[in-house]
């Protein structure tokens, strides 16, 4: 009920150091268009820079605006200004928990003056913050009900914006805060105090801000537990970036999420006939994303320039009026507030929603299609984001017959699954009985093979067509199979062998067996034997099961489908991961295993379409080289010897014989032509 983020106290350092400039210059040349500080300085234009105090005040007030917009009346924020003493800006009273009260008080405080007393320190504000944490809120007073002895949880968070010299100064600041916290608890507990509550836990966040471009000697430190009462974290931030840091911290402090609505069409101020797309960042509860998201959807995230947190990007849809049909799949609604409330796109979006319009937001799926996941609408002067259901709900119609991995709904084995659940029920025993089975026996009884659909199995697909098959399957899974059961199973196996020898096709009747009808009978029985052997291997409890397995393997060898050694070694492993109708493995069956494996790999690559351009060119070159006759020196020379290039070159006798042979052949051909003529 009382969480740590119920109480938040800002301690603002109002010492002389915070009157210096932040060194981020803003141009005043509005007529020349927007310019950065560097461009304005280079052009010699008018420019100014905010002080460290102004940056701290603006960012802290923006922090409390977000809290009060999203959690009105339930989360409280207080401000304490520290210089020579602690100045209380507001209290836990609801009358001071508003923006106008805080801003008017900050105007009266003003920028710190340069000549200051040496007593100015942020420690005064930290002491006052601990005392403020001990003060009960109205909700805590109602929970106590006037009973001082009742323990009420009291936790809080202190955010201190200051500037330290080095790590030693920061360490002394932590020690002083922890000492004062322990002293305050001792005053609240003994004797029992009627003015406050003991502090159960405090989270101290120290923001060490420096001007832009100045290096700090204080190092960042993540959340560290100092004691059971105190956790401390330290962040060193340039003054212009303190607003981004507080926006990042508020996401974790209040479990918020950032959403950027993109592609918002807005008309230009200078040209009313044209429009441009703008983006608006909003903050809301983190549950708006976790409720709507599912396993088939991913939330696209991005990081804005200058920030360190992620924001979810959703696309603007065509706006329309808010109807009950849009809210029917709503899973939850959460308040919304813009990050930059003063920007023109944010104000236009807020006014658009407050006028009674609603906007649907799209998110892309993993497959590339889009789905409407959220909706923005306003009711009672407040803007809400609605998380819509993007998955199938119980109110939707029944799925189509082709939905799901099993194909048709009637293909699932619902009846067999119900019988399996009844057989697998476990009942707690009142006392230990040695006659009951042991834990290992119970684990052995667990089903190891259960096809979900009839289309993924041959044995269970033929149960209605073959009369003796259900009884045969029942005998195979029995733990106490005897000799008589083994004989019956042997008879059924031989009946299968006889029908396979005759070439009878298996009696498939449903559409799932239509593909097997067109195949050969040999292929059907080969798949049937494979599944039957797999089922016997997983249920081989007795020697009778092993006899059946040996008989089936011999039957497969007689049928020309004998398993190899590698197949029998991996059969049990494949039985857990494969179905009888799974694609067959390409395994070598001859002694030249390397060649067959290479051919199988090439064939697999060609069929799967995974060949690269290099493989295609290499195979084409190999096919062309196989057509040409190899060099005779390689064919005739023994291994280890060097083949002589042109062995007959320079031999005059052979050259004369070759020339004479050529002349004789020429004269013979001339005579033959004259005879023909």
From Swiss-Prot:
It is found in: Nucleus; Cytoplasm; Cytoplasm, Perinuclear region. GO terms for biological process: cell division; centrosome localization; dorsal appendage formation; flagellated sperm motility; meiotic cell cycle; oocyte nucleus localization involved in oocyte dorsal/ventral axis specification; posterior mRNA localization involved in anterior/posterior axis specification; regulation of fertilization. It comes from the Eukaryota. This is Protein asunder. The gene is asun. Belongs to the multiprotein complex Integrator, at least composed of IntS1, IntS2, IntS3, IntS4, omd/IntS5, IntS6, defl/IntS7, IntS8, IntS9, IntS10, IntS11, IntS12, asun/IntS13, IntS14 and IntS15. The core complex associates with protein phosphatase 2A subunits mts/PP2A and Pp2A-29B, to form the Integrator-PP2A (INTAC) complex. Residues 578-598 have a biased composition (Low complexity). Keywords: Cell cycle, Cell division, Coiled coil, Cytoplasm, Developmental protein, Differentiation, Meiosis, Mitosis, Nucleus, Phosphoprotein, Spermatogenesis. Residues 578-604 are annotated as: Disordered. Belongs to the Integrator subunit 13 family. Component of the integrator complex, a multiprotein complex that terminates RNA polymerase II (Pol II) transcription in the promoter-proximal region of genes. The integrator complex provides a quality checkpoint during transcription elongation by driving premature transcription termination of transcripts that are unfavorably configured for transcriptional elongation: the complex terminates transcription by (1) catalyzing dephosphorylation of the C-terminal domain (CTD) of Pol II subunit Polr2A/Rbp1 and Spt5, and (2) degrading the exiting nascent RNA transcript via endonuclease activity. A motif (Nuclear localization signal (NLS)) lies at residues 598-604.
């Amino acid at each position: 009920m009382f969480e740590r983020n119920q109480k938040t106290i800002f301690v603002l350092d109002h010492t002389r150091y915070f009157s210096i400039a932040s060194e981020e210059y803003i141009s005043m040349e509005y007529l020349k268009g927007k310019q950065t500080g560097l461009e304005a300085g280079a052009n010699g234009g008018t420019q100014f820079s905010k002080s460290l105090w102004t940056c701290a005040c603006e960012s802290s007030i923006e922090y409390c605006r977000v809290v009060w917009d999203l959690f009105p009346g339930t989360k409280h924020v207080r401000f304490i200004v520290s210089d020579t003493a602690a100045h209380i800006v507001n209290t836990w009273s609801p009358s001071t928990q508003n923006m106008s009260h805080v801003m008017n008080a900050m105007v009266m405080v003003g920028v710190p003056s340069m000549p200051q007393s040496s007593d100015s320190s942020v420690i005064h504000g930290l002491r006052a913050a601990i005392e403020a944490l001990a003060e009960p809120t109205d909700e805590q007073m109602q929970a106590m009900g006037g009973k001082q002895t009742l323990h009420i949880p009291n936790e809080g968070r202190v955010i201190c914006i200051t500037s330290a010299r080095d790590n030693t100064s920061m360490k002394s600041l932590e020690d002083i805060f922890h000492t004062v916290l322990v002293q305050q608890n001792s005053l609240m507990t003994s004797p029992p105090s009627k003015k406050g509550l003991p502090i159960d836990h405090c989270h101290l966040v120290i923001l060490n801000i420096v001007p832009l471009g100045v290096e700090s000697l204080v190092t960042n430190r993540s959340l560290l537990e100092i004691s059971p009462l105190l956790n401390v974290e330290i962040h060193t931030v340039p003054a212009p970036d303190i607003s981004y840091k507080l926006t990042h911290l508020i996401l974790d402090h209040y479990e918020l999420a950032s959403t950027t609505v993109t592609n918002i069409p807005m008309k230009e101020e200078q040209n009313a006939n044209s429009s441009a797309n703008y983006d608006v960042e909003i903050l809301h509860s983190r549950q708006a994303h976790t409720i709507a998201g599912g396993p088939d959807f991913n939330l696209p995230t991005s990081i804005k320039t200058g920030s360190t947190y992620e924001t979810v990007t959703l696309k603007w849809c065509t706006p329309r009026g808010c109807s009950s049909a849009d809210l029917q799949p709503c899973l939850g609604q959460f308040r919304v507030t813009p990050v930059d409330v003063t920007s023109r796109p944010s104000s236009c979006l807020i006014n658009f929603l407050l006028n009674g319009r609603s906007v649907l937001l799209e998110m892309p799926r993993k497959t590339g299609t889009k789905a409407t996941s959220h909706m923005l609408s306003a009711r009672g002067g407040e803007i809400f984001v609605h998380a819509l259901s993007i998955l199938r709900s119980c109110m939707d119609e029944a799925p189509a017959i082709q939905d799901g991995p099993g194909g048709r709904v009637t293909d699932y084995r619902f009846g067999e699954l119900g019988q399996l659940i009844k057989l697998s029920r476990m009942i707690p025993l009142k006392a230990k009985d040695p006659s009951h089975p042991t834990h290992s026996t119970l684990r052995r009884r667990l089903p190891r093979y259960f096809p979900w659909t009839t289309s993924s199995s041959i044995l269970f697909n033929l149960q209605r067509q073959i009369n003796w098959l259900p009884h045969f399957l029942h005998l195979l899974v029995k733990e106490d199979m005897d000799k008589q059961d083994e004989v019956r199973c042997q008879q059924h196996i031989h009946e299968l062998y006889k029908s396979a020898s005759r070439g009878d096709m298996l009696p498939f009747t449903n559409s799932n067996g239509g593909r097997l009808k067109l195949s050969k009978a040999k292929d059907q029985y080969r798949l049937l034997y494979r599944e039957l052997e797999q089922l016997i291997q997983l249920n081989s409890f007795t020697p009778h099961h092993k006899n059946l397995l040996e008989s089936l393997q011999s039957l497969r060898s007689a049928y020309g489908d004998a398993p190899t050694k590698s197949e029998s070694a991996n059969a049990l492993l494949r039985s857990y991961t494969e179905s009888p109708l799974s694609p067959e493995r390409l395994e070598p069956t001859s002694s030249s295993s390397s060649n067959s494996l290479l051919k199988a790999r090439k064939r697999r690559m060609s069929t799967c379409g995974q060949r690269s351009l290099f493989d295609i060119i290499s195979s084409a070159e190999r096919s062309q080289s196989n057509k040409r006759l190899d060099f005779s020196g390689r064919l005739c020379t023994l291994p280890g010897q060097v083949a002589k290039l042109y062995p007959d070159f320079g031999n005059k006798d052979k050259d004369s014989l070759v020339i004479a042979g050529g002349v004789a052949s020429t004269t013979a051909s001339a005579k033959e032509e004259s005879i023909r003529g």
